[in-house]
């Protein structure tokens, strides 16, 4: 688990705008690594400030809220890269970014930020949930946000 300050340092130290955006989505929406990797440009609804997560665990779509800051970061990423289908395309743009690429990005960011703890993309999801709990959000609400089985 990372503190809020460590998360902020890690995101700022991300090796690229693409990595920063992908890791920010992982933390800011509490997504699994596979869910981040499989996001499409069309999953962003800037009017409703939501992000559709297709075929998450249980094979059903869900919607997560986007903060204004996260939406602006995604817009910056889109303007810079103009991804076509996948929000975070892989080395071959017809494929999405891989879980391994996201793991490498989080490790590089943690190292650059001077974070000595073992950090993975799942650490960001865990930190998201813990920070909500620390703010007094009901555990059942957090479970719904994370789409966890009760």
Regions found by a protein language model. Give the residues of each.
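Conserved catalytic core of the tyrosine transesterase superfamily
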Residues: 1-150
């Amino acid at each position: 688990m990372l503190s809020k300050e460590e998360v902020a340092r890690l995101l700022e130290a991300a090796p690229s705008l693409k990595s920063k955006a992908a890791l920010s989505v992982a933390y800011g929406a509490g997504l699994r690594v596979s869910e981040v990797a499989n996001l499409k440009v069309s999953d962003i609804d800037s009017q409703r400030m939501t992000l559709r997560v297709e075929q998450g665990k249980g094979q059903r779509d869900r919607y997560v809220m986007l903060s204004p800051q996260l939406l602006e970061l995604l817009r910056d990423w889109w303007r810079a890269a103009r991804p076509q289908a996948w929000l975070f395309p892989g080395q071959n743009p017809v494929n999405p970014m891989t879980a391994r690429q996201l793991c490498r990005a989080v490790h590089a960011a943690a190292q650059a930020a001077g974070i000595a703890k073992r950090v993975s993309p799942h650490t960001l999801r865990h930190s998201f949930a813990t920070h909500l709990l620390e703010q007094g959000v009901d555990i059942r609400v957090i479970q719904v946000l994370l789409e966890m089985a009760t």
